[in-house]
Amino acid sequence: MVDLKTKAFDFAKNFAIALDGPAASGKGTIGLILAKKFSLQYFQSSIVYRQLAFDCINQKIDVTDMDAVIALSKALKLDSHLDLEHESIGDMASQIAVISEVRNNLNKYLINLVKTTPRIIMEGRDIGTVVVPEADLKIFITANPQIRAERRYKQLQAKGKKCILDEILRQIILRDKRDKERKAAPLLPASDALIIDTSELSAMEVVEEVTNYIKNKIA
């Protein structure tokens, strides 16, 4: 873990947190709690990729038709009423995310959002390394694949959605491989990120660690 004791925070002014990590590592739960605790607007960057995946499926555009996918990414419009959590959408979003032109187009949307939002926590895969490298605080959340699959399985079951644990684990391992090996912004922590392995930690324990870290910086 990188020692960031030399970096001081002025939390009273504009503040941006970049929260990165692999699929189902607990970023969303942790991000929402931190956003509420520190009065930050929370935004999940994967929504733009899932929206694009949904649009491709809806318009019967195959992920291999790169020109069509890229064109669609230039005119993306978010629909907050859609349920974009289905695993098939997440899997296609992961395939779309390896297209560098798509990432460039969607990153423009994300960068503009950060610039126009004074206090924000943005969650994703490359927020601290690409989208907001100047973020006041960068956090990288990770956990082993089996635990992440079990967490996702419980989340989906709680929402009444049918799912198979082994299939979720298979997709998580596949997404990890895509995320880490893609040429455009591979998944990795920023050099100055606070790295937390949540395999044996609850969401509240992680929030407490981050909270103490922030308090030490603004003390």
From Swiss-Prot:
<dbReference type="GO" id="GO:0006220">
    <property type="term" value="P:pyrimidine nucleotide metabolic process"/>
</dbReference>
<keyword id="KW-0808">Transferase</keyword>
<keyword id="KW-0418">Kinase</keyword>
<comment type="similarity">
    <text>Belongs to the cytidylate kinase family. Type 1 subfamily.</text>
</comment>
<dbReference type="GO" id="GO:0036430">
    <property type="term" value="F:CMP kinase activity"/>
</dbReference>
<keyword id="KW-0963">Cytoplasm</keyword>
<keyword id="KW-0067">ATP-binding</keyword>
<dbReference type="InterPro" id="IPR003136">
    <property type="entry name" value="Cytidylate_kin"/>
</dbReference>
<dbReference type="GO" id="GO:0036431">
    <property type="term" value="F:dCMP kinase activity"/>
</dbReference>
<dbReference type="GO" id="GO:0005524">
    <property type="term" value="F:ATP binding"/>
</dbReference>
<dbReference type="Pfam" id="PF02224">
    <property type="entry name" value="Cytidylate_kin"/>
</dbReference>
<keyword id="KW-0547">Nucleotide-binding</keyword>
<dbReference type="GO" id="GO:0005737">
    <property type="term" value="C:cytoplasm"/>
</dbReference>
<dbReference type="InterPro" id="IPR011994">
    <property type="entry name" value="Cytidylate_kinase_dom"/>
</dbReference>
<dbReference type="InterPro" id="IPR027417">
    <property type="entry name" value="P-loop_NTPase"/>
</dbReference>
<feature type="binding site">
    <location>
        <begin position="21"/>
        <end position="29"/>
    </location>
    <ligand>
        <name>ATP</name>
    </ligand>
</feature>
<protein>
    <recommendedName>
        <fullName>Cytidylate kinase</fullName>
        <ecNumber>2.7.4.25</ecNumber>
    </recommendedName>
</protein>
